[in-house]
């Protein structure tokens, strides 16, 4: 009986009826009636939701067997060193490179190791006002009011605090947003890391050299290139699978991209576990053909 399976699952994972209701997109009353065998009509649709929940959990259990711990590759060390320097010296440094090379993972790892580091993740909708509010909320400054008021509050909070402000996907920032970053740096001596795609470096110069003041303040620009070296990819593969047995097949299939490698290994691990079989070069090749990027 599916209701009993759900009860067992809830007990094992200490889940409340409210949590289940959220997952099922139903009311708490519906969950309660279902668990107690008092749901007034056919429960087939709820049984299917239980099946889906259990299947997702099984997939997560398999995922747990994939080691996604941070790996200090040579590329990662270069990025971390650039962040350390910006943090210690109060400099503006840049980390740029193609998608899928591990920029975001470096930023997150640095945050784990340094509580004084601030990470701001931006998206295409991030206007100057949104950016300032994000920074203000992250550092505990006042996020209300006009931009100049929010900026003043941020400056007051960061001045002399020896923090490191890191902006991920900084190539999405407008000229005005980048000017606010420069102003925060100038007024606080706070270290800044701008991380993003290669066009970030072009954006920092400005189409008409209007960001000359910002560009002149950049200390170092760490170019990660378009692909990771094989030695880095080998380290990532061995760490994730706890073996180097499949490195040749994986490195050939991932095309120098860490994100592609991660997707490939996750798929292979999941397939092997679900089908109760061993990972093989043939399986890796099969999965690599399904990857879009």
Annotate each predicted stretch with a short phrase.
Residues 1-48, 52, 223-293:
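C-terminal alpha-helical "lid" subdomain
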Residues 59-72:
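Conserved adenine-nucleotide phosphate-binding loops and their immediately adjacent elements
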Residues 70-87:
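Pre-Walker A adenine-sensing motif
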Residues 87-109, 123-124:
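Walker A/P-loop nucleotide-binding motif
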Residues 94-99, 184-211:
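Sensor-1/coupling segment of RecA-like P-loop NTPase cores
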Residues 114-124:
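Conserved catalytic segments around the Walker B and adjacent sensor/switch elements
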Residues 115-117, 207-226:
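A short helix-turn-beta junction within AAA+ P-loop NTPase domains corresponding to the substrate/partner-engaging
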Residues 127-133, 142-191, 209, 227-237, ...:
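Mid-core helix/loop region of P-loop NTP-binding domains shared across ATPases and GTPases
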């Amino acid at each position: 009986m599916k209701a009993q399976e759900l009860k067992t699952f809830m007990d094992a994972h200490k889940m409340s009826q409210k949590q289940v209701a959220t997952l099922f997109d139903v009311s708490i009353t519906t969950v309660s009636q279902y668990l107690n065998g008092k749901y007034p009509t056919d429960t087939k649709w709820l049984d299917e939701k239980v099946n889906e929940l259990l299947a997702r959990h099984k997939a997560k259990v398999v995922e747990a067997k994939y080691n996604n711990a941070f790996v200090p590759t040579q590329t990662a060390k270069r990025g971390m060193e650039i962040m350390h320097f910006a943090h210690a010296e109060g400099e503006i440094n840049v980390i740029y490179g193609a998608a899928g090379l591990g920029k975001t993972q470096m930023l997150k790892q640095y945050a784990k190791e340094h509580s004084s580091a601030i990470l701001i993740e931006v998206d295409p909708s991030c206007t100057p006002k949104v950016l300032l509010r994000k920074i203000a909320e992250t550092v505990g400054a006042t996020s209300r009011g006009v931009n100049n008021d929010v900026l003043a509050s941020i400056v007051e909070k960061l001045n002399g605090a020896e923090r490191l402000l890191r902006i991920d996907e900084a190539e999405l920032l407008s000229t005005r947003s980048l000017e606010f970053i420069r102003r925060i740096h100038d007024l606080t001596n706070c270290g800044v890391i701008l991380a993003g795609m290669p066009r970030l470096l072009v954006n920092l110069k400005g189409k008409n050299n209007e960001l000359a003041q910002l560009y002149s303040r950049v200390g170092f620009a760490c170019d990660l290139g378009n692909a990771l070296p094989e030695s880095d990819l080998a380290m990532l593969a061995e760490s994730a699978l706890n073996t180097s047995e499949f490195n040749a097949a994986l490195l050939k299939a991932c095309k120098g991209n860490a994100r592609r490698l991660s997707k490939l290994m996750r798929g292979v691990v999941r397939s092997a576990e679900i089908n109760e079989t061993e990972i093989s070069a043939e399986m890796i090749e099969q999965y690599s053909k399904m990857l879009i990027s």
